[in-house]
């Protein structure tokens, strides 16, 4: 992980960042089949969604520009019954460590509203907070 904050600030300013957001959106929008899309661009040093969950969306696009990326589980790592029952993460994660999106990676997550996917949305969570003042910048598109 690159820790030079000067580099981080350069990446997050100006023309290059705007172009990247637009390029990602242009790839995402055709996948939505004309559905309404909501956009979030957030900066936080807090825990977002600490519990492993699935989204009640069609498709969610995530890209972390600063800080740790979204954690996710393969189907063979997850106890879906525990997840649906609201059990704690320790009962949902069956084996290994969660996979994690890297910084600048684009994740396209099928939610439970995706056709034929009602009980098979990607199980994921926000990464644990790195502490006060250690920010995460996340771009999210939902349909």
Q: Model-found features: residue ranges?
A:
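A generic structural signal for short, solvent-exposed coil/turn residues
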Residues: 31-33, 56, 118, 131
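Short linear motifs at secondary-structure transitions and domain/linker junctions
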Residues: 13-18, 35-41, 47-48, 81-86, ...
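Signature of the catalytic double-stranded beta-helix
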Residues: 1-43
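Catalytic core of non-heme Fe(II) oxygenases with the double-stranded beta-helix
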Residues: 46-105
């Amino acid at each position: 992980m690159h820790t030079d904050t000067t580099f981080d600030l350069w990446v997050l300013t100006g023309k290059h960042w705007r172009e990247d957001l637009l390029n990602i959106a242009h790839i995402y929008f055709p996948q939505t089949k004309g559905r309404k899309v909501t956009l979030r661009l957030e900066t936080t040093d807090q825990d977002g969604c600490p519990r492993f969950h699935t989204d009640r969306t069609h498709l969610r696009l995530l890209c972390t520009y600063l800080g740790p990326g979204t954690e996710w589980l393969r189907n063979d790592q997850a106890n879906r019954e525990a997840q649906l029952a609201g059990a704690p993460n320790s009962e949902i994660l069956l084996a290994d460590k969660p996979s994690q999106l890297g910084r600048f990676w684009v994740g396209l997550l099928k939610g439970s509203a995706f056709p034929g996917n009602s009980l098979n949305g990607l199980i994921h969570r926000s990464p644990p907070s790195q502490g006060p003042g250690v920010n995460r910048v996340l771009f999210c598109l939902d349909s």
